[in-house]
């Protein structure tokens, strides 16, 4: 009996030991399995980070090529890495979207190519008055499911017109807002961004009043206080008015002829210091000459500026007054004076007496128009027709503004 009891105790001990060993084995195997899982997870994380870094390198590779060519490269490479990480570029309203893929990592970032410019076909810190109708092919802005967020005019203070106002939209045949404009759904401006008004001012979101703006800084990426840096950029050809000692403003004599001569000599970026008038003869000739170029920039600084007659300029008109204050007497030597300051004038006094820009005749701009003379007025004594063209603006801006990454545009997919 004692032997039997001792035998049973031995069996129980062995059984308990076996159970404990089994439990230990299970725990050990579980630990190893967890360890293997952790190792595998760490390996995957390392691989994912490697793929992310390589994709990020692809973005920087694309950016370097864009800077080198000052635009989209003709042939896009992997920068000699041998890894085949070739960035892809797609055109967007503010510049280019760059996408880089490697493995399961996909990164996206935007390159800005036009300073800090906001959307808008015509942009004005000057008060604007149009004696006639207004027809604008707008900046398409940003696309969403309802259509394009078009912007026809962006202005600081006052906009008024005596005639009908029409946003012509982005579906005009043979007049896309930029090369490569993708609109596969064929949608026009959103209804909230396509104004049509007669007898009243437009209330749509395509005519934007923005009290805070600095057009010079937005275009050139330099504050207006530092405008001399831009003026002295070797890309600019300067046309200077002779100094006037009799208290009258400085005026460039034969300004239209001087502009034409410079364009014909392949100087396409002109900084005009002092007042300037393009008379009817030279408005036509300068317009014709501009179409033989990628686009001209005519910037008039510290003076009155008038454009008379007919023509379609390919380029950017920029009027920038920082310290100059206009007077009706300053127009005395200009052809524009006959119309602007005729008694009675067709331009309301609230605009006429502070006018520093005057446009008369069937003249239009294909490109961009920037009127940066705060507290002054721009008077259009004609029906205003304007064709936004981003290609022209970007080409001109790229000569003065270095392309850069857009802040906040990083996106990992």
Regions found by a protein language model. Give the residues of each.
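Compositional signature of intrinsically disordered, low-complexity segments enriched in polar residues
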Residues: 12-53, 57-413
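N-terminal leader/signal peptides at the extreme start of proteins
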Residues: 1-9
